[in-house]
Amino acid sequence: MPKLRSATSTEGRNMAGARALWRATGVKDNDFGKPIIAIANSFTQFVPGHVHLKDMGSLVASAIEEAGGIAKEFNTIAVDDGIAMGHGGMLYSLPSRELIADSVEYMVNAHCADALVCISNCDKITPGMLMAALRLNIPVVFVSGGPMEAGKTKLSDKLIKLDLVDAMVAGADSNVSDEDSAKIERSACPTCGSCSGMFTANSMNCLTEALGLSLPGNGSMLATHADRRELFLEAGRRVMALAKRYYHQDDESALPRNIANFKAFENAMTLDIAMGGSSNTVLHLLAAAQEADVDFTMADIDRMSRLVPHLCKVAPSTPKYHMEDVHRAGGVMGILGELDRAGLLHTDVFHVAADEGGNLKSVLAKYDVMQTQDEKVKHFFMAGPAGIPTTKAFSQDCRWPSLDNDRQEGCIRSREFAFSQEGGLAVLSGNVAENGCIVKTAGVDESNLTFVGSARVYESQDDAVAGILGGEVVAGDVVVIRYEGPKGGPGMQEMLYPTSYLKSRGLGKACALITDGRFSGGTSGLSIGHVSPEAAAGGTIALIENGDRIEIDIPKRSIKLALTDAELAARREAMLARGPMAWKPIGRERFVSLALKAYAMLATSADKGAVRDRSKLED
């Protein structure tokens, strides 16, 4: 029978000093011997997705203590990618994922915690905590802050739904009046919560449900809705149940590595493809798989992308639906139910929402709105927006008049009526990206599934933005932004501003953009990221020159630079002849701190999840 990890610091006379310190935190005589449950919160007033999390740890703690545990909360950092976007702050976003993972590991291992609840929400926080949870391999439950309500405003007497990307595009579009731009800006992000579309934060929170590590509704229940309170309480109860199964019954199915196994990673990626999730999720799933020692690679993602249909279309791929609409249609469990009926889901995997001995199949039987007989579950998924600006969680209890069970023309479709039989993400490869690259096909217009254009090369995102706004980029160009990968940036910046500015200049469907950087979950259009190997690692993207012909064929999963092998070899020799300046950007002025340099020294390319290169750390 496994011994409580916390016994290391709570048992024996030699631990008298540690017990004295535990007592100073409020632990009583009769508490020693109970499991110590760490609560990793990420409250901050910098991020709308986290501004309402201050009291959530106490809520979880109350359920843990009622179930017989000791709850101890700590906090970790959270970067707002939208606020950090478009300037040097974005260099810190992806590296913060590793810091979050390390900080959770440090706190949990330093204090010998027995189990963990992760209160996350936005872009790098959920992945960082996920990496830590799989690294630690102790019982864990994830519970996020939830999505914000979609913005709504009237323009030209027409009510429209909005999100962050609409504000960015309108702000850069000279055809939009100052009055309308300000109106959109003030309405785009009306409440606390993660941005309202299927951007990175919401995508990752949905994927934790598919991985089996969070409760149904975690990815879709609005941050403002009173029903979300129960998710936090149930997370506390569930983690205690998992801890008892592991420490009292020696049941290893309660451990995250046995829940998030290879089949679960396939389920998560299947969901991601079906719902047209953010391309960043590929990066984070690859990183999490490495922490779990699961052999899940770009090859698996490529294989799955050819099989899974696009069943759920949400902003930024359409203005019609946001996360509040996904929830009304049954949330993640609704999508998983359709995937199961299509024969595309592993249902024999463990799940934290399953009762002891249960699995995903039993969870779907209860929580898939198309098959459940539980009226409480149906009531749960009818939770809707109030349309009142607020930064407070649980501040409203509005309901939709009915569920969206329309699987033919609704937000979630059956396989027969899929938005497309091709999924929402695709892996492309070719001489531009020998180890692959990612495109969010859910956001690509059908007319752009094949594209041939001339390269317009930039050595940084800043130069690309200046070029786009300055009129250098014209219809038919393939904008190439390089040296923005994990190592070359460093930090693999998101390219939401370049894609937004292309849209604002009417070039959203007339140009392509490829980069060794990445894209915000808010990006749509022919935007191809994660080019691997990156420029700084000797990738072919570093050898592209202005005017080169680039051929993109999404149906054939191909991206090709129209040069012969001999021509490429000659360019590579010329690059190597630059000596110490080889594989470095020409003329880029950028301050890179020591912290970022340390990250860059160990960073792998995107096809490996941009994680640390373990080979450089082995003895």
From Swiss-Prot:
Annotated Gene Ontology cellular component terms: cytosol
Cofactor binding note from Swiss-Prot or TrEMBL: Binds 1 [2Fe-2S] cluster per subunit. This cluster acts as a Lewis acid cofactor.
Keywords, in A-Z order: 2Fe-2S, Amino-acid biosynthesis, Branched-chain amino acid biosynthesis, Iron, Iron-sulfur, Lyase, Magnesium, Metal-binding
Keyword presence, Transport: no
Gene3D superfamilies for the chain: IlvD/EDD C-terminal domain-like
Active site: 520 (proton acceptor)
Gene Ontology molecular function: 2 iron, 2 sulfur cluster binding; dihydroxy-acid dehydratase activity; magnesium ion binding
Pfam families noted in UniProt: ILV_EDD_C, ILVD_EDD_N
Binding site residues for Mg(2+): 81, 123-124, 494
Family annotation (InterPro entries): Dihydro-acid_dehy_C (IPR042096), DihydroxyA_deHydtase (IPR004404), DiOHA_6PGluconate_deHydtase_CS (IPR020558), ILV_EDD_C (IPR056740), ILV_EDD_N (IPR000581), IlvD/EDD_N (IPR037237)
Catalysed reactions listed for this entry: (2R)-2,3-dihydroxy-3-methylbutanoate = 3-methyl-2-oxobutanoate + H2O; (2R,3R)-2,3-dihydroxy-3-methylpentanoate = (S)-3-methyl-2-oxopentanoate + H2O
EC number(s) per entry: 4.2.1.9
Gene Ontology BP annotations: isoleucine biosynthetic process; L-valine biosynthetic process
Top-rank taxon, per record: Bacteria
Pathway: Amino-acid biosynthesis; L-isoleucine biosynthesis; L-isoleucine from 2-oxobutanoate: step 3/4; Amino-acid biosynthesis; L-valine biosynthesis; L-valine from pyruvate: step 3/4
Coiled-coil ranges from the UniProt annotation: none
Binding sites annotated in the UniProt record for [2Fe-2S] cluster: 122, 195
N6-carboxylysine PTM positions: 124
Required cofactor names: [2Fe-2S] cluster; Mg(2+)
Subunit structure: Homodimer.
Family: Belongs to the IlvD/Edd family.
Function, in words: Functions in the biosynthesis of branched-chain amino acids. Catalyzes the dehydration of (2R,3R)-2,3-dihydroxy-3-methylpentanoate (2,3-dihydroxy-3-methylvalerate) into 2-oxo-3-methylpentanoate (2-oxo-3-methylvalerate) and of (2R)-2,3-dihydroxy-3-methylbutanoate (2,3-dihydroxyisovalerate) into 2-oxo-3-methylbutanoate (2-oxoisovalerate), the penultimate precursor to L-isoleucine and L-valine, respectively.
Protein name per its UniProtKB record: Dihydroxy-acid dehydratase
Organism: Shewanella sp. (strain W3-18-1)
